[in-house]
Structure formats: C-alpha cells, structure tokens
C-alpha cells in the first residue's frame, strides 16, 4: 500500500469519496463480524474495476483512512453483504427534560436539524420492505391469513364520485357536524342537495338548518304525504306471507297485553272449573240417591236416614272440590262459588270487574253441569237441595250461613294469607267442604253454594218456595267470615303467635319489611281514629 505511488480515494463510511459503493463479499447468512475488522483494512474492503477506472498519477500524498477502531469490539447481527434499508436505528438516550416535558420515550431514534430528539415512528407508516422480503413467507401472518387491514394503502376513494350524478351529493346527515373542530376541512360535509360545482356548505360558515319544521330529521316530509280525510289501508293480497303475518298479529298483540284478556282467561277457567267440580259432585249424588223414595231431592222426610248415602255425598263433594281447585287455582283462583267470590272482593283479594266475570261463569257452570248429568245418566235426576227432617226456614238459613262461613274463612287463611302451606291449600279447602257436607246434607242438602242450588232448579224447571235460603244463607256466612278475618287482622294476629308456619317473606319475626308494614298499618288506623288522617287517604 505504501509502496505504490497512486492516490487512493478517501475512505468514508461505506462509500468512497467518489460516491462509489463499497463491495463486500457476498454471504447469505448473518454472521457476527467485528466492526473493527470491517474498517481496519480499506485496501481489501473494496475492489475497483481497472478496465473502467484507474487512479491517476498525482503528487498528492497518500491519506490513510481514519482509525475508527472502537475501544471494545462491537459485534453486529446484521447481514453485511447487503445494504441496510432506510435509516439505521441507533440506541436512544434519555432526552433533556425540556424536550420531552418530563416523559422519557425509550424508542427515540431520530434527531432533527436542531438537535432535538424526535420520537420513534411506528412501522405502520415507515415499512421496511427489505426486511419483509428477507422474511420467509411462512413467518408472515399476512400471507397465511390475508386481511384488508394488512395492506398499506392511501385514503380510500370516494366511490360515489365514480357514479353519474355524484355532484348532487349524498343526503344530508342526521346531525350538524360543521361545528366540530376535530373534523378536517378535507372531509366531505355536503348536506342536502347542492348544485354541481358549488362549494360545500361548510365552506360558507353558515349553520345548516332544516328547510321546514315539517321536515323530519331523516329529510322526509311526513306531513305532506299524509292522506287527508282517509285512513291508511293495507292491501293484504299484495303482502308477502311474513308481512301478512306481522300485520295480522298487531291487533292480537295489543289485545294480549290488555286486562280484558286476563279477565277473559280467568272467566273461561272459572266456567270450566265450576262445571267439572259440580259435574262430578252431581254425578256422585245421583249414584247415592238411586234408591231414594223422594223424587228430585237429596233430602226429605220420605228419604230417611242412611249413613252410607250421607258419607258418599260428603266425600264426592269434598274430593271433587279439592281436585279441581288444585287444577284451576293458577288460572282463575279456583273459587267455584259466588259466596267465596263475594268474600274475596270484600277483603280486597280480587277487583270488582274480575268478580263480576267470575260470578256469571260460576252460575253458567252450575247450569252446564246439571244439564250434563241430566243428559248422561239414565236414572232419575235427583240432585236438588231442599229442607228436610222438619227443618224450619230460619234453621236452614243459619245452618247454611255457619257452614259457608267455615268454608270461606278456610279459604281466607289458607289461600289468601301466604305461608308455607299455601301450595297445599286445596287439600284444606276440600276437607272443609267435606266436614260441612257431613253436617248439612241431611238437614239442608249441604249447598253452601248458590250456583250448586241454582243450576239443578233451572234444568229441572222446579223452584221450591225455600230456594231463597240457598242465596241468603251463604251470603250471610260470607259476611261472618269477612268480619272475623278483618277483626284478627286488625289485632295483628301475626304478632300473637309468630313463627308457626310463616315463611321468610310473610312472617314478621323473620322479615323486617313485613313487620314495618304491620306497624305502618297500625299507625294509619290510629291517626284515622283520631281524625288527623282523612278517611280514604293513604299514609305516604
């Protein structure tokens, strides 16, 4: 090198002073090469083609390249056989606090002309394509699972500009975005219809408003398209099966969510339940009275006393009521008795409109059951109720009243009052009717139910002169039961012997809310009695 008299170009980084790229020996694998070895022998680091260029003879002294050997060998993992693409990232140092405002970014890699450290930019904007090409196709997820977001692209074009008549612009948006500062001016804020070539409306600086108050937010004037004086009609013949089903379902859906529908369902359930209850009861009575000497009656002096007949009738009435109440109490409450319905209204368990519907259903159910027994069984129709064994009218009224009071009060305590045994209330109700029939069948026929006595009289066409006691007696018994029920409620019977069979929701010793409700009712009655609370008002 020193023996030659030629001038060598000055060595600067990876290029010569003339701008020629240094040729390095080719290698397909990355290798750990000391940087010191790379730059220590510039005479072997590159070779010039003598046919194309030869150093001229000159008297300039030979300049040796600067000694760039580091103090400690530094190894690099880069492939030195090919030039690095883009700028090579250098280790960042914490910038001065005045530049980063106290936040240190460990990814600082660039420096501006002023010497200020710049933050690193993500590879999303500056993609190293050489690095991508060097990667195997199997290691790139974008080749195995192509997705539109993997491809670099510029701003998507406004496709509607490729359509004829795009100058009219889209329909105006729902909201006015012209006042938003985060929207760039290059965003298309065309609202409404504008002429071809006209400037967008946001450029004028005026706030876009609706053309009229009749125009809706979606740009459609519903008022101008309304039919004057006529109602909108739908041609069912021009609808698809799905549209036809939807149109026909609208009135049905509205009706299904109404109280009228609920009353209708309860009425139907009460009619069917009363019919089934009295049908089995009448059929059993018909069987028990086959050998009776008195026609069209279940009791009478000529009938005589037969313990088997009395027991059979009591059992069939009690079990028929128990089974059918258990079936229908979820639908209508399973009352099957106008006297019980009246009692439920007086204690506030059911509203008056529901009670009226149930009353007519019970009367019709008694008539239907009587007609079924009359038409199905070949024996003489013998299920009517009359006084017997020298029973007076007054005695008959009070016998019916007391027996009915016992039945109605049983229903209040087992069904109306909620407790652990509420779900087996039909058993207790059926047993209550059973013991009442055991007492009353011989003397009054054991009616306890105006519908039970009214139905057979209608079917047979014969009304006895004492038929009225089967209305007055049960109604009187209902008032007796209601009075006693309200009396013990006023005395707070729940607090007298708590914890017997009350559940966690209704026992005041277990539920503090229930206890507060009882105390609030006590205070309300006290204030009402002292005149501080007007009758009919509620305690807030």
From Swiss-Prot:
Cytoplasmic side of membrane: 1-263, 330-332, 378-393, 442-467
Extracellular side: 285-308, 354-356, 415-420, 489-540
Pfam families: MIP (PF00230)
Residue ranges with Polar residues bias: 25-44
Membrane topology: Multi-pass membrane protein
Region Disordered: start-end pairs: 1-224, 499-540
Transmembrane annotation, as ranges: 264-284, 309-329, 333-353, 357-377, 394-414, 421-441, 468-488
Reaction(s) the record says it catalyses: H2O(in) = H2O(out)
UniProtKB keywords: Glycoprotein, Membrane, Repeat, Transmembrane, Transmembrane helix, Transport
Induction details: Expression is higher in vegetative hyphae than in conidia and infection structures.
Keyword Glycoprotein carried by entry: yes
GO cellular component: plasma membrane
Disruption-associated phenotype: Leads to a slight reduction in the vegetative growth rate and delayed conidiation.
GO MF, one example: water channel activity
Glycosylation site positions: 296, 530
Biased composition (Basic and acidic residues): 119-133, 140-155, 174-194, 204-214, 502-530
Subcellular location field: Membrane
Domain of life of the native organism: Eukaryota
Function comment: Water channel required to facilitate the transport of water across membranes. May play a role in the vegetative growth.
Family, similarity comment: Belongs to the MIP/aquaporin (TC 1.A.8) family.
Entry protein name: Aquaporin-5
Annotated source species: Botryotinia fuckeliana (strain B05.10) (Noble rot fungus)
Lineage of origin: Eukaryota, Fungi, Dikarya, Ascomycota, Pezizomycotina
Gene: AQP6
